[in-house]
């Protein structure tokens, strides 16, 4: 039985992490599956993971970006500097531990789930190992981000995109490389037994309620739309740092 390794930043709450767990649960039916995880944020994956999937934690460190920014905001310079140095050491450990895993694993297939992993996998992955990048984000006209993805994945065998439009976009960008782009949509854990009739005038958004997700922008946009279409409602489902702000 062939072995698949999936490189993961952590197994906490997040869309990428949910997709990683769903993929691992599917692949373990036919492969040995190991998730190589940089950070151990919780005692176990927050999403239900098949017992056949092995999780290997590469470090004992945890990210400290939040603490660093909090001290900066409060102008506690010494503590911010201390957290900054701690963060730099953490980035060094993260890079070295991930590269060591890539070079030493006996896996036949390695799947990267972040652009930083894409680059390291392309540079340090062993000959004969199938190297796959899995891009979850849309570049949203940010060509710096898109070009970074192209640079990071140019030495991989495949780049998996979650939409047809992204597949077409990156296929053109990677045309002069050996990296082939393929479209594979995200996995559904379970197919719903009952389908929506789609007759209600409701807008529904589900996700982590954090600043980068743009829920305040969504709410502002809905306030404009609702003036012209007052019978439509907006349901925001989720939890996170901006929940209280959204509720108020």
Question: What are the language-model segments listed below?
Answer:
Residues 133-140, 154-192:
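Donor nucleotide-sugar binding/catalytic pocket of nucleotide-sugar-dependent glycosyltransferases
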């Amino acid at each position: 039985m062939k072995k698949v390794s999936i490189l993961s930043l952590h197994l906490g709450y997040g869309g990428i992490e949910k997709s990683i767990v769903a993929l691992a649960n599917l692949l373990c039916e036919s492969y040995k599956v190991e998730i190589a995880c940089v950070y151990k944020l919780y005692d176990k994956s927050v999403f239900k993971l098949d017992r056949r999937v092995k999780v290997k934690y590469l470090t004992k460190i945890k990210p400290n970006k939040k603490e660093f920014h909090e001290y900066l905001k409060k102008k506690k310079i010494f503590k911010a500097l201390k957290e900054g140095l701690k963060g730099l050491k953490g980035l060094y450990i993260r890079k070295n531990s991930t590269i060591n895993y890539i070079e030493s694993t006996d896996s036949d297939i390695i799947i990267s789930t972040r652009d930083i992993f894409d680059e390291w996998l392309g540079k340090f992955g062993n000959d004969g190992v199938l190297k796959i990048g899995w891009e979850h984000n849309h570049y949203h006209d940010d060509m710096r981000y898109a070009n970074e993805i192209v640079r990071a994945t140019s030495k991989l065998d495949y780049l998996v995109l979650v939409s047809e439009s992204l597949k077409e976009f990156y296929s053109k960008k990677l045309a002069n490389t050996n990296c082939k782009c393929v479209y594979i949509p995200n996995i559904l854990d379970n197919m719903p037994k009952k389908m929506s009739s789609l007759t209600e005038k409701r807008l529904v958004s589900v996700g982590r309620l954090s600043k980068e997700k743009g829920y305040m922008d969504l709410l502002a946009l809905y306030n404009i739309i609702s003036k012209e279409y007052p019978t439509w409602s907006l349901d925001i489902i989720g939890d996170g740092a901006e929940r209280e702000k959204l509720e108020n």
